[in-house]
UniProtKB/Swiss-Prot annotation:
Source organism of the structure: Dioscorea elephantipes
Subcellular locations according to the entry: Plastid, Chloroplast thylakoid membrane
Primary gene name: ycf3
Biological role: Essential for the assembly of the photosystem I (PSI) complex. May act as a chaperone-like factor to guide the assembly of the PSI subunits.
GO terms (BP aspect): photosynthesis
Protein name as annotated: Photosystem I assembly protein Ycf3
InterPro entries: PSI_Ycf3_assembly, TPR-like_helical_dom_sf, TPR_rpt, Ycf3/AcsC/BcsC/TPR_MFPF
UniProt topology in membrane: Peripheral membrane protein
Family: Belongs to the Ycf3 family.
Domain of life: Eukaryota
Length: 172
């Protein structure tokens, strides 16, 4: 087994142990514990990282039924969006990213992922010969990237450069 895989397994196991200890000692309601358990099983227990998207989605959906904190819920919804993105289900992914941002408007990675999807749709429209639709998708991508960059200046360098090159950058 390669060293990186051994280290990864060690980190996963350590994270699981720490999460279990915290779950026992931090005062939480039974609903919060249940939500965290589903979240942990969906994310920390490697279902998502191993490509078991159906299992991870099931755990995330269960977590959304139990989690009431908007901030925590935003990350669960964001992770559901990630899985739908990985599966090529871009419309569903956008829906979950929107829901995540509604609960936590300071989630630059959700804005970035929405921009990437819009940019991809713009590229597809170009291949179909529909430049007007492509421009609309690119304009939307630009808006999302501006929001992501505004939240985390210095990140998303490639997006920043694309905004400059395409003359869609209005701030600076």
């Amino acid at each position: 087994m390669p060293r990186s895989q051994i280290n990864g397994n060690f980190i996963d196991k350590t994270s699981s142990i720490v999460a279990n200890i915290l779950l026992r000692i931090i005062p939480t309601t039974s609903g919060e514990k249940k939500a965290f358990t589903y979240y942990r099983d969906g994310a920390i227990m490697s279902a998502q990282s191993e490509g078991n998207y159906a299992e991870a989605l099931q755990n995330y959906y269960e977590a959304t039924r139990s989690e009431i904190d908007p901030y925590d819920r935003s990350y669960i919804l964001y992770n559901i969006g990630l899985i739908h993105t990985s599966n090529g289900e871009h419309t569903k992914a956008l829906e979950y990213y929107f829901q995540a941002i509604e609960r936590n408007p300071f989630l630059p990675q959700a804005f970035n992922n929405m921009a990437v999807i819009c940019h991809y749709q713009g590229e597809r429209a170009i291949l179909r010969g529909d430049s007007e639709i492509a421009e609309a998708w690119f304009d939307q991508a630009a808006e999302y990237w501006k929001q992501a960059i505004g939240l985390t200046p210095g990140n998303y360098i490639e997006a920043h450069n694309w905004l400059k090159i395409t003359r869609r950058l209005e701030f600076e």
